[in-house]
């Protein structure tokens, strides 16, 4: 409570208790969730200027990294757009649909929290039916994941969430933590949709235990029986790619990127998350979300709290 007292007169220790009970580790630098979402994140990411980067249709236009999933066509506010974001007619869309290799991925342009709204049409007819009455979406290639990740769960993509921080002291990008997310029983990899998550240490090794949304622990994948004690392949390349992408994001200091390793051993960035960052993957493994940067962030947020700017404007 003492460590976080400057942010609230009454500290809720439920986050601390939960992290301690799950990990067996007690650390005062575990961030209380209500403080993270009301004080820390809004201060570090105190702008709506980059909210357009949460739209998946704009990834390939903004980022120099060309490994994002190929987009076949888009719909933005009811208008159909081609790969280059040029306006096209529905008859053009029908022509594109006839030439696609199925299955494909249909997903909302943004707000896919928990995998909401993501579908995998297996035919022209299924995709056409799914377009009916919908807007603000993108249709992409379906990535074939690397055999290493297929071992854990072959249904959908198993992704690695990489959380990064642009330091307030030197503006350099640092990786905070990484987590492998996997589907279970046919679910997507999102924990809120029934998936599980396994923390990855700084060397790229899984920490041996996966956790579901209820805090239940698994030493082996419930479906495949694969142990969570392996090393992530091409881990250094993952770190390099995540830092490269994050360096192209400005006006925010916290970023979370979701990656999948494809069959060609290439890390494919799937999604960019700038708001509502998930902190419990690391903390449930006994690691404070901000790690060695906790002290500098706390001091920065005390002096530069977003609410102070509102007060000054008034």
Predicted stretch roles:
Residues 1-88, 95:
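Conserved N-proximal alpha/beta basic substrate-recognition cap immediately N-terminal to
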